[in-house]
Amino acid sequence: MVLGKVKSLTISFDCLNDSNVPVYSSGDTVSGRVNLEVTGEIRVKSLKIHARGHAKVRWTESRNAGSNTAYTQNYTEEVEYFNHKDILIGHERDDDNSEEGFHTIHSGRHEYAFSFELPQTPLATSFEGRHGSVRYWVKAELHRPWLLPVKLKKEFTVFEHIDINTPSLLSPQAGTKEKTLCCWFCTSGPISLSAKIERKGYTPGESIQIFAEIENCSSRMVVPKAAIYQTQAFYAKGKMKEVKQLVANLRGESLSSGKTETWNGKLLKIPPVSPSILDCSIIRVEYSLMVYVDIPGAMDLFLNLPLVIGTIPLHPFGSRTSSVSSQCSMNMNWLSLSLPERPEAPPSYAEVVTEEQRRNNLAPVSACDDFERALQGPLFAYIQEFRFLPPPLYSEIDPNPDQSADDRPSCPSR
């Protein structure tokens, strides 16, 4: 008898969402099928699946041991979230080559269902970073007598949902800073920066309204700017490795001496990025909005406002502090807080982010320069995949103006 051959071995998931993409959360049931197609008749010892979820970090550092001796120090750490095994055909022992242990599979296509439940405890969101990752996968192994096993692995995505409708993420973020430039014995007037955003939590695809006032009482020409940064932190063996990446930015008008610029809701759109990861012990992903003043020949004046990128978008009537920039007409008076009859909610995370977009979106930048211009050219490079048009005209004003701003002395007349 001529034995048949394995033509294909595939894994498919039973997707329960409209996008037909396998996306799950803690406590969900992951189900699917192992699809086997054979030509002719084959004998099988076992068909197994192995499902696993884990976070893993790894990086290396060069060390100097003295006397021109150098060595490499490896830093690795791993956290396992679940480990599930099941046998779809056959038995546990693959070394049993007796005829009694074989199962015959006839020519054609065959499906073998599998199912397992994810832990109820919080799981880290799927992530691919510079020095680590969070991955979830199912692996199928087909074992046959006297032949090498056929193996296949397929990943699926897990989101640990972050609801931005919680009070802590709906609270406004604001700050004020001032800087005085000195050159030898000469001191110029101060440069002041005040900035505020409506809330801390956003989802990809939303635009952040930036309210800011920049006053230039110095003798130099300055430029106000804003940027969204992602910070990846990896932990292993008591050490920490950090990577900072630019995800979006914008530039204001140049300010000459004695001038002031006001941003009344300047828009900065959040591109497709991974949500924040805050509950993993070895990988942490955080975001911040940096509003800053580019000062030639001096350290920049910058103000960091923390952000959380979530997966559950803002409810249309969730809060009076909710951003309505993407749902309301441009001529709506923001001060009156009048809402449209049926505003459209911001897009959900799955609607705007694909795995390919998330991986390709981030452009690495140096994390240790702290905004010093050590190299030629602009401080922040554009992400080539995301070139932003100028923000639309916006006539809305800050509903909660800083009363002390009216009492602040303006630049002296020149």
UniProtKB/Swiss-Prot annotation:
GO terms for biological process: fat pad development; heat generation; negative regulation of adenylate cyclase-activating adrenergic receptor signaling pathway; negative regulation of cold-induced thermogenesis; negative regulation of heat generation; negative regulation of locomotion involved in locomotory behavior; positive regulation of hippo signaling; positive regulation of ubiquitin-protein transferase activity. Residues 405-414 have a biased composition (Basic and acidic residues). The keyword Phosphoprotein does not apply. Induction: By troglitazone and pioglitazone (selective PPARG agonists), by prostaglandin J2 (PGJ2) and by L165,041 (a PPARD ligand), by vitamin D3 and, to a lesser extent, by phorbol myristate acetate (PMA) in the promyelocytic leukemia HL-60 cells. No induction by retinoic acid, nor by clofibrate (a specific PPARA agonist). Up-regulated by fasting. Changing K48E: Abolishes interaction with ADRB2. Changing K153E: Nearly abolishes interaction with ADRB2. This is Arrestin domain-containing protein 3. Changing R52E: Abolishes interaction with ADRB2. Gene3D superfamilies: 2.60.40.640. Adapter protein that plays a role in regulating cell-surface expression of adrenergic receptors and probably also other G protein-coupled receptors. Plays a role in NEDD4-mediated ubiquitination and endocytosis af activated ADRB2 and subsequent ADRB2 degradation. May recruit NEDD4 to ADRB2. Alternatively, may function as adapter protein that does not play a major role in recruiting NEDD4 to ADRB2, but rather plays a role in a targeting ADRB2 to endosomes. Residues 393-414 are annotated as: Disordered. A motif (PPxY motif 1) lies at residues 346-349. Keywords: Cell membrane, Cytoplasm, Endosome, Lysosome, Membrane, Repeat. Coiled coil: none annotated. It is found in: Cytoplasm; Cell membrane; Lysosome; Endosome. The keyword Membrane applies. It is a peripheral membrane protein. GO terms for cellular component: cytoplasm; early endosome; endosome; lysosome; plasma membrane. Changing R58E: Nearly abolishes interaction with ADRB2. Belongs to the arrestin family. Its main location: cytoplasm. Pfam families: Arrestin_C, Arrestin_N. SUPFAM superfamilies: E set domains. Highly expressed in skeletal muscle, placenta, kidney, lung, liver, blood, adrenal gland, lymph node, mammary gland, thyroid, and trachea. Very low levels in colon, thymus, spleen, small intestine, bladder and bone marrow. Strong expression in differentiated adipocytes compared to preadipocytes. Detected in omental fat and subcutaneous fat tissue. It comes from Homo sapiens (Human). GO terms for molecular function: beta-3 adrenergic receptor binding.
